[in-house]
Design a protein with these regions (language model features):
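N-terminal mitochondrial targeting presequence
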Residues: 1-59, 82-83
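Non-catalytic regulatory/accessory regions that flank a structured catalytic core
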Residues: 45-82, 121, 130-149, 160, ...
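Short cysteine-rich clusters marking metal-coordination/redox-active sites
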Residues: 92-98, 107, 116
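Short metal-coordination and nucleic-acid-contact micro-motifs, chiefly zinc-binding Cys/His arrays
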Residues: 91, 103, 111-112
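Domain-level detector for long C-terminal conserved domains
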Residues: 300-495
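Mature, well-folded catalytic/scaffold domains that follow N-terminal targeting or propeptide regions
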Residues: 69, 84, 248, 280, ...
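Positively charged, amphipathic N-terminal segments that serve as targeting/anchoring signals
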Residues: 80, 87-92, 99, 126-360, ...
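Cys/His-coordinated zinc-finger cores
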Residues: 109-130
Length: 495
């Protein structure tokens, strides 16, 4: 597991508790102008039972840190989780000045352990390049754990059909979706981190997508593929949708490959995806597929018991139809989540048949271009396993040649779109180079979405514990491909 996915998963567990414990005074079905909100319905006086319930309601937690007191050295932080983070960094991170020594000195500018000593910190001429983002990350993490009311996590409900959503950027999306007014950059970073996965998917698929042929992000093949999907996502209102499209409407199936942190997001966050498509004829089935997917029964529950966002899993059930550990939960009439703990190639047959009008794939930071890391055989591992692992190391293969090879070939054969995301320009370039160089893959696809920045990338820095100088942003850039379709004209000429 990469540092990005590890820190992201921890962050999402924390957000799950924050979302479920937040009880806003203003309902999410309210609208606001200039920060002043009012309920859409007439306010009724509280009944006696309601008043009694208020008296018995748990008091809000005591705020640990004020907004002007968020910067603390991690080692001496008043938050236990931050002190634990500092301990992990000190245990594995190397000093950039003296690489033979572990970090042990907290940078006074950012609060992270970055060097082995003050003398090493003072002699480092590169520290000004990275400490500003580390300080921002420091304050963001303390703010999340300050136990202040997280008003930005009051997520809106269904979008009225007649209200248009704007997907040009985070600010316009939050405004047109009816989020509470967010005036601070820090709150915007928190929300972007929470919503980057469903909004990245929605922005690509939506008819008002910020990616088009006009700005040269979408190719002509991409336009054709997304037009097919959008016919299912945006059926005409007030018409017989099945008659218009000439077929029965099936759920939109979204397959998230190699899922890790994505599967641990609260279901309420994934509900924001169908809210972008308010037609009553549209529903979504989201499949989280990967050996590191977290099943609900494996989620860690705090001492206070399951949270409200975890209670939704009580509606679900284990799903034995995939041949691997799996769990399905109906979140709402328009959204069902499936957690499948296994490689895609193991369940490909069970998921078919596929339809480019309703099926689409996403892979967030798949690491196609990263070197293959073989599984270390356990104590009972045989000699054959050890030889295979050593062979992988010796040939210096990349993940698209080994772990992902069969999966990607199967997807390309189905002619359904595959969109990927990376956490940095270098990460995306590695994936692109891998796709364009691996035999039996490089000539088998067309580009749908040219690689480039993601409008709905997370704006929050994720800091690597193995080297605090390394910080990235989830889903920084995106790309898209699809298996080549047979060129009938070329085939006719060949005969």
């Amino acid at each position: 597991m990469s540092f990005l996915q590890s820190s992201t998963r921890t962050h999402h567990r924390w957000l799950t508790r924050q979302i479920s414990s937040y009880h806003p005074h203003q309902p999410s079905s309210s609208r606001s102008i200039f920060g002043l909100g009012w309920p859409l319905g007439k306010k009724k006086p509280p009944t006696g039972e309601a008043m009694a319930g208020r008296k018995n309601a748990p008091s809000p937690p005591t705020r640990l840190l004020e907004s002007d007191n968020l910067f603390h050295p991690l080692t001496s932080s008043p938050i236990a989780a931050m002190r634990e983070k500092a301990a992990r960094i000190r245990a594995i991170a190397r000093c950039p000045v003296y690489p033979d020594q572990l970090v042990g000195y907290d940078c006074p500018e950012c609060g992270y352990p970055t060097h082995s000593s003050r003398e090493a910190w003072e002699s480092d001429g590169e520290k000004a390049k990275y400490w500003p983002r580390l300080r921002e990350a420091n304050e963001d993490e303390h703010d999340l754990r300050s136990q202040r009311p997280m008003l930005e996590f009051d997520l809106p409900d269904c979008q009225p059909y007649e209200e248009t959503i704007t997907l040009a950027n985070w600010d316009l999306l939050l405004y047109t979706r009816g989020f509470r007014s967010i005036d601070e950059d820090r709150s915007r970073r928190h929300v972007s981190k929470l919503l980057t996965y469903p909004m990245t998917i929605g922005a690509i698929l939506h008819e008002f997508s910020p990616y088009s042929t006009r700005n040269q992000r979408l190719t002509l093949e991409g336009y054709r593929s997304l037009t097919a999907l959008r016919q299912s996502l945006h059926p005409p209102l007030g018409t017989n949708t099945a008659q218009v499209l000439g077929r029965t409407i099936n759920p939109i199936r979204i397959f998230i490959l190699g899922a890790r942190a994505e599967s641990s997001l609260p279901p309420a966050v994934w509900s924001q995806l169908p809210y972008l498509f308010p037609s009553p004829d549209v529903s979504f089935q989201v499949y989280f597929i990967g050996p590191e997917v977290i099943l609900p029964q494996q989620q860690i529950t705090g001492p206070e018991g399951p949270t409200e966002s975890q209670d939704v899993y009580k509606r679900g059930r284990p799903n034995m139809s995939f041949g691997v550990p799996a769990f399905s939960v109906p979140v709402s009439p328009t959204l069902t989540l499936h957690m499948i703990q296994g490689a895609y190639r193991e369940v490909h047959g069970a998921l078919g048949p596929f339809d480019p009008y309703t099926d689409v794939y996403f892979a967030f930071s798949p690491g196609f271009g990263f070197p293959t890391v073989p599984i270390v055989p356990g104590p009972g591992g045989g000699a054959a396993e050890k030889r295979e692992s050593q062979a992988l190391l010796d040939c210096q293969s990349i993940q698209l040649q080994t772990n992902w090879n069969q999966d990607v070939k199967l997807i390309l054969e189905e002619k359904c779109a595959l969109f990927g995301a990376g956490f940095s320009p270098a990460d995306v370039q590695r994936d692109v180079d891998a796709l364009e160089s691996v035999e039996e893959i490089k000539d088998q696809f067309d580009w749908l979405l040219n690689p480039g920045e993601n409008v709905f990338a997370s704006q929050k820095w994720e800091v690597a514990e193995f080297d605090p100088r390394v910080a990235v942003k989830s889903n920084y850039a995106i790309w898209g491909i699809r298996g080549k379709r047979m060129n009938h004209m070329a085939l006719a000429h060949s005969h």
